[in-house]
C-alpha cells in the first residue's frame, strides 16, 4: 500500500502552517478511512492547533486602553462653576479716577475761603467754581476733603486732658483760648450761681480792692493837707482871701477815720471854696477892677486927711 509514503508529505504542510501569522490551514490528505495513521499523528500533537498566535500592535493597543464600562468617568465641570468663571471674565476692571490738579492760585483762594467759611451753600459753591474755572463737583469734593483733614488734625493734636469738661464740650476750643480762660469758668460748668458767687466774693482781689480804697483815702487826705499848706503860703492882698482859708479849715476839722459819706461832703465843700477863690482872683485881676480900686483910694485920701 502507498499509505506510509503519504504521511511524511503531510508533516511539512503542518510545519509551514505554524510559521505563518494566520491560523493553521487544514491539511487535506484524503479521507480518514484511508489514513488511519494520520489520526494518531493529529492526536499526538494537539498543542500545535491550540497555540495562540503572537499579539499584533493593534491588539496591544486595544488591551492597554481601559474599557469604557469598567473605567471611571472623568469629572466634568458643573454649571455653577461654569457660571462663576463666566462672571469673573465679565467683571470689568474699575478705572481709577483722575485726580484734579489745582494750581497755586486756586489753592490760595480755596484755603482763604475755607478759613473764613467751612460750609458753603449751593449758590456759593457755584459762584466759587465759576471764579476758579472749576466744576461744582470739584469744589465740593475739595471742601469735603479739607474738612476731614482738619478734623483729623484736631483729633491728633488735641491735648489728652483728663478733664471731662473739655472732652464733653460741643464746640471745639483751641489750646490758646483754653489756656487764657479763667480757671473759675471750668470749676462749675453747669453755671450754678452759688458757686460762682462764692468764688468771686472769696477771691483775694476783693481784699486787695479794699486795701486800695484805704490807700486812696489816705492819699486824698495827704493831698488835701498839701493843698491847704500851699494856699496858706500864698499871699493874697484881696479881702476875699480869707474865704478859702475858712472853707479849708472847716474841711480840716474832719478826722481821717471818718466814714466815706463825710469824706465826700468835705471834698465837695473844699471844691466849692476853691471855685469861689478862683472867681474872685479872676475878677480882681482884670484892669477895670484895678482902676476902680485906684480911683477909690485917691478919692478917699483927701477926706481922711
Curated annotation (Swiss-Prot):
Region Disordered, annotated ranges: 1-95
Sufficient for strong transactivation activity: annotated span: 241-305
InterPro entries: Distal-less_Homeobox_TF, HD, Homeobox_CS, Homeodomain-like_sf
One annotated GO molecular function: DNA-binding transcription repressor activity, RNA polymerase II-specific
Keyword annotations of the record: Activator, Developmental protein, DNA-binding, Homeobox, Nucleus, Repeat, Repressor, Transcription, Transcription regulation
Segments of this protein annotated with the region 8 X repeats starting with a Trp in each unit: 196-240
A Gene Ontology biological process term: stem cell population maintenance
Pfam families membership: Homeodomain
Alphabetized SUPFAM superfamilies for the sequence: Homeodomain-like
Region entry Required for DNA-binding, spans: 122-151
Cellular compartment(s): Nucleus
Polar residues biased stretches: 65-83
GO cellular component, one term: nucleus
Main location (coarse class): nucleus
Highest taxon of source: Eukaryota
Region of interest (Sufficient for transactivation activity), residue spans: 196-240
Sequence repeats: 196-200, 201-205, 206-210, 216-220, 221-225, 226-230, 231-235, 236-240
PANTHER family (alphabetical): HOMEOBOX PROTEIN, HOMEOBOX PROTEIN NANOG-RELATED
Subunit composition and interactions: Interacts with SMAD1. Interacts with SALL4. Interacts with ZNF281/ZFP281. Interacts with PCGF1. Interacts with ESRRB; reciprocally modulates their transcriptional activities. Interacts with NSD2.
Family indicated by similarity: Belongs to the Nanog homeobox family.
Function: Transcription regulator involved in inner cell mass and embryonic stem (ES) cells proliferation and self-renewal. Imposes pluripotency on ES cells and prevents their differentiation towards extraembryonic endoderm and trophectoderm lineages. Blocks bone morphogenetic protein-induced mesoderm differentiation of ES cells by physically interacting with SMAD1 and interfering with the recruitment of coactivators to the active SMAD transcriptional complexes. Acts as a transcriptional activator or repressor.
Name listed for the protein in its UniProt record: Homeobox protein NANOG
Biological source species: Macaca fascicularis (Crab-eating macaque)
Amino acid at each position: 500500500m502507498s499509505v506510509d509514503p503519504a504521511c511524511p508529505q503531510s508533516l511539512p504542510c503542518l510545519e509551514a502552517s505554524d510559521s505563518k501569522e494566520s491560523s493553521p490551514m487544514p491539511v487535506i490528505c484524503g479521507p480518514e478511512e484511508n489514513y488511519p495513521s494520520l489520526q494518531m499523528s493529529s492526536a499526538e500533537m494537539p498543542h500545535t492547533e491550540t497555540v495562540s498566535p503572537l499579539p499584533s500592535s493593534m491588539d496591544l493597543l486595544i488591551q492597554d486602553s481601559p474599557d469604557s464600562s469598567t473605567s471611571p468617568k472623568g469629572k466634568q465641570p458643573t454649571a455653577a462653576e461654569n457660571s462663576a468663571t463666566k462672571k469673573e471674565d465679565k467683571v470689568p476692571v474699575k478705572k481709577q479716577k483722575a485726580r484734579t490738579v489745582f494750581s497755586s492760585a486756586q489753592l490760595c483762594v480755596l484755603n482763604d475761603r475755607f478759613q473764613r467759611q467751612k460750609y458753603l451753600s449751593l449758590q456759593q459753591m457755584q459762584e466759587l467754581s465759576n471764579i476758579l474755572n472749576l466744576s461744582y463737583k470739584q469744589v465740593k469734593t475739595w471742601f469735603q476733603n479739607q474738612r476731614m483733614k482738619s478734623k483729623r488734625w484736631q483729633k491728633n493734636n488735641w491735648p489728652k486732658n483728663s478733664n471731662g469738661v473739655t472732652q464733653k464740650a460741643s464746640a471745639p476750643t483751641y489750646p490758646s483760648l483754653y489756656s487764657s480762660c479763667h480757671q473759675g469758668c471750668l470749676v462749675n460748668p453747669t453755671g450754678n450761681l452759688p458757686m460762682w458767687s462764692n468764688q468771686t466774693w472769696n477771691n483775694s482781689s476783693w481784699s486787695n480792692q479794699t486795701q486800695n480804697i484805704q490807700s486812696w483815702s489816705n492819699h486824698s487826705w495827704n493831698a488835701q493837707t498839701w493843698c491847704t499848706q500851699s494856699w496858706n503860703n500864698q499871699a493874697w492882698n484881696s479881702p476875699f482871701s480869707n474865704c478859702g482859708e475858712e472853707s479849708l479849715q472847716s474841711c480840716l476839722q474832719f478826722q481821717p477815720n471818718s466814714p466815706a459819706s463825710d469824706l465826700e461832703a468835705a471834698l465837695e465843700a473844699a471844691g466849692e471854696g476853691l471855685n469861689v477863690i478862683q472867681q474872685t482872683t479872676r475878677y480882681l485881676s482884670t484892669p477895670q477892677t484895678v482902676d476902680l480900686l485906684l480911683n477909690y483910694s485917691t478919692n478917699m485920701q483927701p477926706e481922711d486927711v
